[in-house]
Amino acid sequence: MDEQTTKDHIQAHADAVVRGDMDTVIADLSAELQPQAPQLAAGLPMPVTEAEVLSLDFAEDESVAQIRYTGDSGAVTLRSRWQDGDEHPVIVHVEPVG
């Protein structure tokens, strides 16, 4: 994985969540995770008003990001594993932290 490309894409993903750009958010999910998008979105505070990439760990074949999403109803931090997709990095696993 290219570190800078991955870092930029993960930040763009977090920004898309704040904008409510669900087409972009879903496109960042692996084909296996896309059907779970409604359940994943339901776990976020609504509306999401801020997303902060707290950490990003790079490895050769995947990267792990922790992103805190904040909204009117509170905040949640998610850990996501990213791998290279056909056109851009995609999320292959996501889970709440804590």
Walk through the language-model features, giving the residues of each:
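Surface-exposed, charged secondary-structure patches
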Residues: 37-86, 91-98
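TPR-adjacent "capping" and linker segments in tetratricopeptide-repeat scaffold/adaptor proteins
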Residues: 1-4
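Short solvent-exposed beta->alpha transition segments
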Residues: 7-8, 12-15, 19-61
